[in-house]
Amino acid sequence: MTQTIAIDVRILPHGAGLPLPAYQTAHAAGMDLLAAVAPDAPVVLAPGSHAMVPTGLSIALPDGFEAQVRPRSGLAARHGVTVLNSPGTIDADYRGEVCVLLINHGKEPFTIQRGERIAQMVIASVVRAELAITTTLSETARGSGGFGSTGR
């Protein structure tokens, strides 16, 4: 069963008039984030370039939760545009604007218009770890095998 939590959202002046992030299907894990760029000033991402794109909102996550900013698969597949620091993490104590760091890995310039769906935001529970220093670790079949060690 899906858990639902309440999140306070503040709409910033440049986000006025844009819809709130929304889930596009009944079982979607992420809600789409929209670009809050000025209508007369779209952001053009040249191939190989990146830009911080505003969403026009800030959020107050409940303690024990984070928001992950992830790429939209369609933008990546069709245009090579993705979230550079994927997943971007928004901590529960952050109150600044939610922004999306996009990069264009494609071969053509990509224009981001106001209201365009640019990323998705997934709300997740946070588990904190307590680290314990030791001189040995338990044995596993994999051992210290790293990159590529489990085959192709």
UniProtKB/Swiss-Prot annotation:
One of its GO terms (molecular function) is dUTP diphosphatase activity. Disulfide bonds: none annotated. Substrate binds at residues 72-74, 85, 89-91. This enzyme is involved in nucleotide metabolism: it produces dUMP, the immediate precursor of thymidine nucleotides and it decreases the intracellular concentration of dUTP so that uracil cannot be incorporated into DNA. This is Deoxyuridine 5'-triphosphate nucleotidohydrolase. One of its GO terms (biological process) is dUMP biosynthetic process. Signal peptide: none annotated. Belongs to the dUTPase family. The gene is dut. PANTHER family: DEOXYURIDINE 5'-TRIPHOSPHATE NUCLEOTIDOHYDROLASE. Keywords: Hydrolase, Magnesium, Metal-binding, Nucleotide metabolism. It comes from Bradyrhizobium sp. (strain ORS 278). It is an enzyme of class 3 (hydrolase). Its EC number is 3.6.1.23. The keyword Metal-binding applies. Its cofactor is Mg(2+). Pathway: Pyrimidine metabolism; dUMP biosynthesis; dUMP from dCTP (dUTP route): step 2/2. The keyword Hydrolase applies. It catalyses: dUTP + H2O = dUMP + diphosphate + H(+).
